[in-house]
Amino acid sequence: WCIMSSPLLIGCDMNTIPDFSLKLLKNKELIALNQDVLGLQAHVVQHENESYVLVKDIEQKRGLTRAVALYNPSDQPCDFIVPFETLELGGNVKVRDLIKQKDLGKMKGEIRQTVQPHSVMICKMEAEKRLEPVSYEAEWAYLPCYDDLGKKSKPIVYVPASDCSGRMKISRLGGREENFAEWSEVYSEKGGNYEMTIFYSCDKNRKLEVSVNGTKTVLKDLNSNNEVKSVTIPVSLKQGYNTVRMGNDFGWAPDIDRFTAVSYTHLRAHETCA
């Protein structure tokens, strides 16, 4: 409830609540996380086997401090290895376990932790540097035509997919102008030219319309034989937040797994190092 900024409701008999559960409910650091001024919900950035890693900004958007949950809903212990780059954190990272209310010291590169079955580890992490995001999952997108009540015929849906990065994809995208997927917080530190790579799947030729801040690119004849494939296009991002929209006004678009956006400056730096 705290990592998702959910309402705080106690659904048990307070006369018989176990001491551990009562202590958890009274944990001031978890309550502070739940009541964080930003009021954001965490999103999944890593999903391997049955484990999940969720992250969100706290205190300040695009700041150096983030909340991270290592969630293990399975029946077996889970060994987490989470690169700090995945969490958009750079340099030395100060880690605090909020459930145990214990500092774990400074770490660099990654965090490694074992989480017991049906358990979660919630951390507050403070980094030396905030990294620019690279990957944007399909399940983070806003879907204006999404319908969870089952009242629409062939509605746009999130579909489990083991070959996708987050184990989910968007299906039944397009068919009409208003049935799109939109990411409104595609962030660029300085703005400029970027290489956008879109990961998709479909079983026949499909068209995808990609709009970046209103500038549209049309990709025709995409066909992956139901495998996850990628297509790369050049895009221009402004400094700060950008809006990316995908769909197809007059036919079905391919299913979308995710997309990445990497600046040409970053690509050239890697090529120079190589």
Question: For each predicted feature, which ranges?
Answer:
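A short beta-strand element within beta-rich, extracytoplasmic domains
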Residues: 188-203
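Short, surface-exposed beta-strand/strand-loop-strand elements in extracellular ectodomains
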Residues: 206-215
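Carbohydrate-binding surface patches
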Residues: 1-4, 9-11, 47-89, 118
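C-terminal beta-strand-rich structural cap/linker in extracellular carbohydrate-active enzymes
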Residues: 107-133
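Conserved small/polar residues in nucleotide/adenosyl-binding loops
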Residues: 265-272
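Extracellular carbohydrate recognition and processing domains
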Residues: 215-239
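Short beta-strands within extracellular/lumenal beta-sheet-rich domains
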Residues: 164-187
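Short beta-strand-plus-loop segments that form exposed binding edges in beta-rich domains
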Residues: 245-252
